[in-house]
């Protein structure tokens, strides 16, 4: 549950940031800040190491260590998006309250992008699921890969409208509207490339119609142009 005060919301969001699938050198699919022991495994399985070895003497856990299923994070985001608006009027700083909503949309888009680029279409959940005694009601079918990228774009458009344009509102290292634009440009470039160079399979669960490639490239281009217009960033 959320503590509906500034510190409570900040704590809630901090946990979501901590779990973001940021693919740096200390990230595994299971989480951020992998331990020193685990960190040594990454070069071993990526081809970076000069020599690699395997001491896997058991099949227990096979196929699970590298899984990327962000639905725990997505549930926490959906819980926030569903419940926070009822308390939003309690905060005098409406800019900050909007920024928190923008962060939630940004984080959800980030998680979905991490999954869709690995698996193609995945189930889209807009609200937290509740177990009511029937497990079948929780089994949501996969959406198409196109639907997932469109959902990511939708979330990032909302994030762009709600997030501040500087770090002073939320704090250093947290999302701004420009982070939303940057992520959108990257995600839409992926979508356009999948459409142009990939093939559609499984009734659209994997792949995007080639005719839509330029539409996604245009979305990526417009996001970059909006970033350029801010005059806050440059290539180096």
Predicted regions and their residues:
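Short, small-residue-biased leader/transition segments that mark boundaries at the very start
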Residues: 2-4
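TPR/Sel1-like alpha-solenoid repeat signature
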Residues: 105, 181-187
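Short, small-residue-rich loop/turn micro-motifs
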Residues: 126-130, 156, 189-193
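Aromatic- and acidic-residue-enriched carbohydrate-binding clefts of CAZyme catalytic domains
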Residues: 129-140, 209
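Conserved, well-structured interaction surfaces
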Residues: 7-14, 18-28, 43-119, 135-150, ...
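Short coil/turn linking the two alpha-helices of tandem helical-hairpin repeats
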Residues: 116-117, 123, 190-199
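Short, surface-exposed recognition loops and adjoining beta-strand edges that mediate ligand/DNA contacts
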Residues: 27-43, 125-128, 164-182, 195-236
């Amino acid at each position: 549950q959320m503590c509906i005060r500034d510190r409570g919301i900040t704590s809630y969001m901090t946990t979501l940031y901590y779990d973001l699938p940021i693919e740096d050198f200390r990230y595994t699919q299971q989480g951020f800040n992998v331990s020193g022991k685990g960190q040594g495994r990454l070069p071993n399985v990526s081809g970076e190491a000069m020599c690699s070895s395997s001491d896997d003497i058991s099949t227990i856990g096979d196929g699970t260590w590298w899984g990327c299923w962000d639905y725990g994070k997505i549930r926490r985001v959906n819980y926030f998006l569903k419940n926070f608006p009822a308390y939003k009027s309690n905060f005098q700083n409406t800019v900050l309250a909007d920024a928190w909503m923008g962060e939630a949309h940004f984080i959800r888009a980030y998680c979905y992008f991490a999954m869709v680029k690995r698996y193609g279409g995945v189930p889209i959940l807009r609200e937290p699921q509740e177990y009511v005694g029937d497990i079948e009601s929780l089994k949501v079918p996969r959406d198409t890969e196109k639907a997932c990228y469109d959902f990511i774009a939708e979330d990032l458009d909302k994030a762009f409208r709600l997030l501040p344009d500087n770090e002073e509102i939320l704090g250093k290292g947290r999302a701004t509207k420009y982070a939303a634009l940057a992520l959108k440009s990257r995600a839409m470039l992926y979508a356009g490339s999948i459409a142009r160079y990939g093939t559609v399979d499984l009734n659209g669960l994997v792949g995007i119609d080639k005719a839509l490639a330029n539409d996604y490239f245009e979305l990526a281009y417009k996001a970059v142009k909006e970033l350029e217009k801010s005059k806050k960033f440059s290539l180096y």
